Amino acid sequence: MAEFLLELYSEEIPPQLQIEARSHLKQFIENSFKENHLKYKDLTVYSSPTRLTLYAKNLSEKIQIDAKEIKGPKVGSPDQVLQGFIKAKNVSKKDLIEKKTEKGKFFFIKTQPKAILTEDLLKKIVPKAIESINWKRSMRWSDHNLMWGRPLRSIFARFNNNKLLFKFDHLETNDEVIIE
């Protein structure tokens, strides 16, 4: 089982905004873990005037996704509808299976079982989580386009005791904690 530690270092955040940011970050990450079937034991969020920190322990290192059947359009639907389904699911026409149901004959596709590394999933989820924090007032600073509650200076991220590499706007993660 693995651990994940995220620390966002910024200029001073007022106490009420810290509470809201903690709550929002925790909710977003918990929902994302649930959507992606990522198991964990405990997820805690802390804050101080200059830091917002998330710690998750006993994370699965891989997520196993089972094969499943996905229902598509009805057999006899316009070709345009069928092509849209094929494109959306990134399959070819030969992958389609016709099956009879209570409501008629439909096209289905069968997905393959696969494993996703938790590290790869975190690289997608965490930037979205940071971006999604709702601030009552956001500010832009320097020549960056990032709008955030206070100027964000650094992102520390470690998964399973290794640096978790991702980029959020102009910032790249690092594995050094800033002490001031």
Positions of predicted regions on the chain:
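Long, basic N-terminal domains or extensions that often function
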Residues: 1-180
